[in-house]
Amino acid sequence: MGLDCRSVVDVGANRGQFSLVARHCFPEAMIVAFEPLSGPAGCYRRVFGGDSRVSLHQHALGSQQAVTTMHVSCRDDSSSLLPMTPRQRNIFPETGESGTTVVSVGRLVDSIRASELKPPAMLKLDVQGYELEALRGCEELLDSFSYVYAEGSFVELYEGQVLADDLIAWLRRRAYRLSGVYGVVYDDRGRAVQADMLFRKAVLDSGGTD
């Protein structure tokens, strides 16, 4: 991707998969992670326990502080604050719901100050359909990020989730331009289901804004 980040905010950190990649790519970066589930959060702490530039907050991000229900998947990285649709279970049968648990939700500004986000900063979101609510929970600090890296779905996998088109439009209105699409997942009929999308703040694009 050719990026250089000094700060990474990892929302939906799970067991630290993305944070490990970020640490490899950006050895000196500060990483602030959010993971509401106790099992994955415990694994994350074990993985990064010796890294003084990594911190973990054990709650989800949303537009307001709350306590709510999380739908726990048999594969915990597919857990969501939104219920699964039959389509999710059909395409990814190993991700069926195994139960629910109560988690806390907060806003990004309640956990970190803008002055702590050394530029360039990246906001990563992997929250299983809850991307728009998570972004709203980050909006006060959104201008601090040069990059947003988010999973986007082209079909509804979780009830009421934002789809990729609306996610792209929301970020575009805030001067973020889609600059890369990675890891596209297709169903058995060859239709795109979801992908990871990289957005860059427009001022970083050599072509300017339109």
Residues covered by each model-derived region:
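Phosphate/nucleotide-binding beta-alpha loop and adjacent structural elements of enzyme active sites
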Residues: 1-210
